[in-house]
């Protein structure tokens, strides 16, 4: 499966995984995930970290990664998958992760990497005590599936007898953990009698002796399951109550002030800092991007919206100039400082292709008012003419709610909208995913993100040890 299609699926398909009692796992896109994993386990798994991927899709990636064998994978790939699984178990809502772990039990998937991930979630999650209190039966099932019922109960008996570091515990349990000292108390909590059953001790079934409680069934008060992830993958975006030309990101806001005649020296200095800060978040793209930049009169806008759309398009151009080894800009109509005239996007695309780029990106508000339909005809003709260079359409919007009914000049082209500087975090991976030169960039960007998240996960583990 091609990367853009998989990315779009991860960012739009929001159907939950469900596990009916006594039924089979309901996973409506399992074939798609299995095919993507088979094509490249590391690339597939890293895409779960792509900005904008949905929680239930990330849960599916976690499930597929843990369910699949790692036979034949090199050590570096195994390490990447292990770190990613650890990050996802902390960055997903706990209920999602518990569903994944129970699904692994239902699928009878139990590899060493699966065991390690399950045990570290059950015993080392920062909210493990609250999770066990709320979902003890489910987590007990996960624990016994990971170790095997006999080994799990053998460990529990030894811990109940005061053993914390015997060879038996090290070989069967503690070697899988990063903070072994936290395990005994939580194993005891897993096998503790339900709150309403206070007599008797631990039995071989994980129930309280002398009670009629079934294994894994709580009869005490229901505890609330923590619903917030311990690790944040995508920071929540604060939407302004009213969108204006100057609250759509620092780069665009500074450009608007410049276009309106503000103090140039101070504004240019600030602009450079803002672009540098934004570019620092991305690796270099070792290829050529040809940017068809719509600088027609409609991009300027009017009234309170004046310069809003063009400034955001210019912000994208400035960011790409810092990220790409080579950026060719083809302006259509006028130029950034003096937008004018009509929109001839088709000619702009043909001129851009003449530069021999790896990718052509059209940035426009979508109003094609010179030879309407030309861009669609050119887009349809290029493959027949043997042109294989990917062309994508980046919709410059005023807000995310813009009506694009009359603003799709080439419906066959891949399209994505952007209105705020924060949208660049999803726009750039989407753009570069369409060309072969973008695959190494995407891998580097996602590896960088994994490194940052893995350090944050390690900090959580360190806090647990303290």
Q: Can you say where each PLM-predicted feature lies in the sequence?
A:
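…and closely analogous acidic/polar surface helices at protein-protein or active-site interfaces
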Residues: 286-287, 299-327, 331
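Long lumenal/extracellular ectodomains of secretory and single-pass membrane proteins
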Residues: 1-206, 210-290, 295-302, 330-466
